Amino acid sequence: MTQITEKELKKKYLDLLSQNFDTPEKLATEIINLESILELPKGTEHFVSDLHGEYEAFQHVLRNGSGNVRAKINDIFKERLSTKELNDLTALVYYPEDKLKLIKSDFQSCGQLNVWYITTIEHLIELIKYCSSKYTRSKLRKALPKQYVYIIEELLYKSNEYQNKKSYYETLVNQVIELKQADDLIIGLAYSVQRLVVDHLHVVGDIYDRGPQPDKIMDTLINYHSLDIQWGNHDVLWVGAYAGSKVCLANLLRICARYDNLDIIEDAYGINLRPLLTLAEKYYDADNPAFKPKKRPDKHERLTQREESQITKIHQAIAMIQFKLEIPIIKRRPNFEMEERLVLEKVNYDTNEITVYGNTYPLKDTCFQTINRNNPAELLPEEEEVMNKLLLSFQQSEKLRRHMSFLMRKGSLYLPYNGNLLIHGCIPVDENGEMESFEIDGHTYSGQELLDVFEYHVRKSFDEKENTDDLSTDLVWYLWTGKYSSLFGKRAMTTFERYFIADKASHKEEKNPYYHLREDVNMVRKMLSDFGLNPDEGRIINGHTPVKEINGEDPIKADGKMLVIDGGFSKAYQSTTGIAGYTLLYNSFGMQLVAHQQFNAKEKILSEGIDELSIKRVVDKELQRKKIRDTNIGKELQAQIDILKMLMHDRYLD
């Protein structure tokens, strides 16, 4: 094979590029355009985390931009509209289809409705003009409803300096109304406002968990205009299951059974659980209190006795399979240091006791019918067959394939973005704040390098789904439960103890020292430096652990260098946090932390227009307004400019 020199490669590259810019005018126009964009204010970033399958609350936060929509409406209309009119306009932007129906039902005549249409279209056009003031026309055009781009642009950029176009603009709007297009235009404008108030969304982990509709969240994210994802521990569990890890699959099925969410598996992803139910009906009883499903906050009707019985049996069956499947992984991976989690081997089946971490406990609510005392890891032939069928169904689900592929494409374990470090869980450290080391495949890694190796193995496992017990697949499970995992952030997962031991002291899961050291500004500065970020300007944006505001905990830690934004979307945590969690806004002027009240129902917003979200706290104000030049995108644009200037000098100026 002929070696190509760097000079020849550069010439070939410039030759290809010149095909797009075959005149100096075209090239100059592109350079001027990109250089100008660098001077625009940076767009608003919106950070959310720990969605936990709570679609209704999540989509509401997306619609209101964590209060950004109402703030823009107040900026323009507060002095011109009454409180009721402001509330109605806000609700219309949030839920245009629903609010339109309510508003239209109030009018007695077409004439009154038409006047409202004209006024509302004017207000929405004015709002879009304000929300898009820091965008190029090209970027704004992409945010507008395609079928009405021409009409909207005419209204946005209308100029009537010489009174020549007055009737033209009036006819535009009147014809929209006369041809029954006003509803669709208003709906399109409302969604354009939602899109314009947030330039980029960061999802800092855990789309999945105990909530009822993670699939709907995934569909929403797939259609979102610009985002990235930092994987959470629950996200990686689902990725692992799809990638071939039977123990990850057993874990997520157990969680779905525990929280009465098996309809995610059956209805949302079309996976048949009948073989698992048949196995469960054969071996397990319905009266085991430890395995009865938790009551779902969003479900008003109770489970029937038969439904509860079936879920209780499935819950036991899949838990036992999970504990069995963990044993061979722990044994073939001594570097995981998980010998204490060989729980089925530590049970004394004669005395019904277990000895873990040097303590012996009596066991309750046991269901060891399928355990071979001499070989606890052994799966029954039926259990093996059920897991093979379930794994095949998981990997053949088209919807799940689409969702998991999107998670891989848009996701990562951590992300340096615009000077900040986004990470769901933690950076594993010891009590002295030194990065903890972990051995993988004969090499020792810590800090950023360890996270990079973890991510490499997640991607390798995903690409090689046919391998179910290789190192990469085992490491995906380790990320869910291992002591040096950046996602788990604890020393051990005490699932077995929570089911079978009454003494709650055995349930305690010791957190990585990271979680108290992150209060120390010097520690956070060191972490930022270790990840190649400027400790004077950067921050760590963290999810994973609910902030217990009810107990006085502050989400702003280490003098503002650490921001914890576990969204608290999960209803299960709201009694311990006192709120529905936090989101973060970062625009060209600085950062604002937004505290949310519990989202109850959109009906109240539609009828009253009062949004119970948000108390904003300014984290900081930029001394100098940030421009696109100062962002990740700015660096990419600058690289493009440098190449285009190189082409200009090579072809047209020299």
UniProtKB/Swiss-Prot annotation:
The keyword Manganese applies. It comes from the Bacteria. Residues 298-307 have a biased composition (Basic and acidic residues). GO terms for molecular function: fructose 1,6-bisphosphate 1-phosphatase activity. It is an enzyme of class 3 (hydrolase). Pfam families: FBPase_2. Residues 288-307 are annotated as: Disordered. SUPFAM superfamilies: Metallo-dependent phosphatases. This is Fructose-1,6-bisphosphatase class 3. Its EC number is 3.1.3.11. Its cofactor is Mn(2+). Pathway: Carbohydrate biosynthesis; gluconeogenesis. Keywords: Carbohydrate metabolism, Hydrolase, Manganese. InterPro entries: FBPtase_class3 (IPR009164), Metallo-depent_PP-like (IPR029052). GO terms for biological process: gluconeogenesis. Coiled coil: none annotated.
